[in-house]
C-alpha cells in the first residue's frame, strides 16, 4: 500500500500497535504478582492503548473497523496474559513457599544477627525443605513461571550460602585490643559486618522495608575504606585479621545488585557453582553422545562404546558434591535421569536387534509386547530429540502416542504366561518412564 495515501486512522492504529508490541516481551516474561509496581505499570500502558484504539474514528469504513478490532484484540490478549502470569496457580504456589521462607528468616535469622542465639538445625532443615519444594514446582516451560521460580530460588539459596559461609568460617578473631590501637577499630568493624549480614538477609528476603541495597552497599564500602585507612605498622597478625574482615565484606557486596535494586537475585547465580559446572560438563558430553547416536547411519556400531561412556558419566555424577544444597541435588537427579534414559534407549535398541537375529516361535501375547516395545523405541528416539513445552503440538502428539502404547499393553492377555506377565510389566514401566522423561524435558528447569 502506498503509505502516502494511507488513511490517517489506519496510520494511527499502526502507531498504537507498535507501542503495544514494544511491551509484549515484558508481559510474556512478567514473573511478579498483581500488586507489583511493574504489573501496574504494564497494565496502565495497555489500558491506555485500549482507550487510544477505542478513540480512533472508523468513519464507518469496514477496513478501518477491522483494523481497530484486531488492534483491540491484540491489546486485550496481552492484558489477559499479564493477569494470568500474575495469578497462575503455580505462581501463587511459589509465592506461598517464599512467604514460608520469609517467616523462617524473620523468626530465626534476624534475631540471631541482632545478638540472639546461634542458627539452629531447625532453620537449616527448614530452608533446605523450602528450596527442595521450589525445585519441584512445575513451570510447563512457561517463561514467567521459570523466571519466578529462578528468582525465588536464587534469593533463598543466597541466604543459605551467606549463613553457611558465616558458620563455617568464623574469622580467627577478635584479637586483644591491647595488641595494637588498630585492633579496637577492626573489632568494631567486624561487629558492624555481622549486623550488615543480617540486614542483607532481610533485604534479600523482603523482610526489611527500612533499608535499600544501595545504602547497604555504601555502608559496606565505607567500612572497607575505614579498614584501608588503618596503620597496622607491619604487624602480620593484625594485617591478616584486617584482610579476613575485608574478605567478609566483599563476600556480602557480591550479593548486592546496584543497577536494579528491585532484583537482588542477579548477584547470586547458582550456574557458577562448582558442582553445577561439573553437572553441566557431564550433560554436554551426554548430549554429544545422544546426537551421534540419533544421527548415525549405523547406530549399532556405537552402542557398546556409547553405553560404556554413559556409565562413566553416571559415576562422575555420583561424585558431585551436593553441598547440602537441594538445588544441586535436583540438578544432579535430573542429569542422572537424562543419562540413564539414553542408556535405556540403547539397551532397548540392542534387545530389539538381538531378537531379529534369533527369531523363534513365541507366545502371541509375548509377541504383542515386543511389538509395543518396538513402537516405544521409535517414540523414545523422538522424545530424546524433543525440545519444547507442554503446549507444543509435538508434545501432545508424543503424549498421545505413549498413552496408546500403554492402552495396547493393557489389552495384552498373558494367558497365565509368567514370562509374558514380566515382559508386559517391564514394558509398562518403560512407557511410564518415557512419559515422565517427556514431562521433565518440557519443564525446562533452570538453576
UniProtKB/Swiss-Prot annotation:
Function per UniProt: Co-chaperone for HSP/HSP70 proteins. It functions as a nucleotide-exchange factor promoting the release of ADP from HSP70, thereby activating HSP70-mediated protein refolding. Has an essential role in maintaining proteostasis at junctional membrane complexes (JMC), where it may function as a scaffold between the HSPA8 chaperone and JMC proteins enabling correct, HSPA8-dependent JMC protein folding. Inhibits both auto-ubiquitination of PRKN and ubiquitination of target proteins by PRKN.
GO molecular function, one term: ubiquitin protein ligase binding
UniProt note on tissues of expression: Expressed in the heart.
Subunit structure and binding partners: Binds to the ATPase domain of HSP/HSP70 chaperones. Binds PRKN. Interacts with HSPA8 and JPH2.
Protein name: BAG family molecular chaperone regulator 5
Notes on the domains: The fifth BAG domain is responsible for the interaction with HSP70 nucleotide-binding domain.
Annotated ranges, domain BAG: 9-86, 95-167, 182-260, 275-350, 365-442
Domain of life: Eukaryota
Gene Ontology BP annotations: Golgi organization; negative regulation of neuron projection development; negative regulation of oxidative stress-induced intrinsic apoptotic signaling pathway; negative regulation of proteasomal ubiquitin-dependent protein catabolic process; negative regulation of protein refolding; negative regulation of protein ubiquitination; protein folding; protein stabilization
Keywords: Cardiomyopathy, Chaperone, Disease variant, Repeat
Associated disorder: Cardiomyopathy, dilated, 2F: A form of dilated cardiomyopathy, a disorder characterized by ventricular dilation and impaired systolic function, resulting in congestive heart failure and arrhythmia. Patients are at risk of premature death. CMD2F is an autosomal recessive, early-onset form.
InterPro entries named among the record's database cross-references: BAG_chaperone_regulator (IPR039773), BAG_dom_sf (IPR036533), BAG_domain (IPR003103)
A GO term from the CC aspect: nucleus
Signal sequence interval, chain numbering: none
Record-linked SUPFAM superfamilies: BAG domain (SSF63491)
Amino acid at each position: 500500500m502506498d503509505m502516502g495515501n494511507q488513511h490517517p486512522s489506519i496510520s494511527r492504529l499502526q502507531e498504537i500497535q507498535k507501542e503495544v508490541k514494544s511491551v509484549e516481551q515484558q508481559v510474556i516474561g512478567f514473573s511478579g504478582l498483581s500488586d507489583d509496581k511493574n504489573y501496574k505499570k504494564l497494565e496502565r500502558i495497555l489500558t491506555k492503548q485500549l482507550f487510544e484504539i477505542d478513540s480512533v474514528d472508523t468513519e464507518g469504513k469496514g477496513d478501518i473497523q477491522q483494523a481497530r478490532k484486531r488492534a483491540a484484540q491484540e491489546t486485550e490478549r496481552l492484558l489477559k496474559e499479564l493477569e494470568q502470569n500474575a495469578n497462575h496457580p503455580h505462581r501463587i504456589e511459589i509465592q506461598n513457599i517464599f512467604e514460608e521462607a520469609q517467616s523462617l528468616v524473620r523468626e530465626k535469622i534476624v534475631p540471631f544477627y541482632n545478638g540472639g542465639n546461634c542458627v539452629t538445625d531447625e532453620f537449616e532443615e527448614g530452608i533446605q525443605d523450602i528450596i527442595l519444594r521450589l525445585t519441584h514446582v512445575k513451570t510447563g516451560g512457561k517463561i514467567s513461571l521459570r523466571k519466578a521460580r529462578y528468582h525465588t530460588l536464587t534469593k533463598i539459596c543466597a541466604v543459605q550460602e551467606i549463613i553457611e559461609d558465616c558458620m563455617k568460617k568464623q574469622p580467627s578473631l577478635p584479637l586483644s585490643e591491647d595488641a595494637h590501637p588498630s585492633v579496637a577499630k577492626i573489632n568494631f568493624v567486624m561487629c558492624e559486618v555481622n549486623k550488615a549480614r543480617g540486614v542483607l538477609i532481610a533485604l534479600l528476603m523482603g523482610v526489611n522495608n527500612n533499608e535499600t541495597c544501595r545504602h547497604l552497599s555504601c555502608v559496606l564500602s565505607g567500612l572497607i575504606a575505614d579498614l584501608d585507612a588503618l596503620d597496622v605498622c607491619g604487624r602480620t597478625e593484625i594485617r591478616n585479621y584486617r584482610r579476613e574482615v575485608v574478605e567478609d565484606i566483599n563476600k556480602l557486596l557480591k550479593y548486592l545488585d546496584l543497577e536494579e535494586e528491585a532484583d537482588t537475585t542477579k548477584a547470586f547465580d547458582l550456574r557458577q557453582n562448582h558442582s553445577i559446572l561439573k553437572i553441566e560438563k557431564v550433560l554436554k558430553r551426554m548430549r554429544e553422545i545422544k546426537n551421534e547416536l540419533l544421527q548415525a547411519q549405523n547406530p549399532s556400531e556405537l552402542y557398546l562404546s556409547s553405553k560404556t561412556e554413559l556409565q562413566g558419566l553416571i559415576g562422575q555424577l555420583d561424585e558431585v558434591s551436593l553441598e547440602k544444597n537441594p538445588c544441586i541435588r535436583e540438578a544432579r537427579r535430573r542429569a542422572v535421569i537424562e543419562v540413564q534414559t539414553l542408556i535405556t534407549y540403547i539397551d532397548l535398541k540392542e534387545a530389539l536387534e538381538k531378537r531379529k537375529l534369533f527369531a523363534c516361535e513365541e507366545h502371541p501375547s509375548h509377541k504383542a509386547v515386543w511389538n509395543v516395545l518396538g513402537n516405544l523405541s521409535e517414540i523414545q528416539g523422538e522424545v530424546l530429540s524433543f525440545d519444547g513445552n507442554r503446549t507444543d503440538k509435538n508434545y501432545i502428539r508424543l503424549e498421545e502416542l505413549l498413552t496408546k502404547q500403554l492402552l495396547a499393553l493393557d489389552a495384552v492377555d498373558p494367558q497365565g504366561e509368567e514370562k509374558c506377565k514380566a515382559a508386559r510389566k517391564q514394558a509398562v514401566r518403560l512407557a511410564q518412564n518415557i512419559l515422565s522423561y517427556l514431562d521433565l524435558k518440557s519443564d525446562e528447569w533452570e538453576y
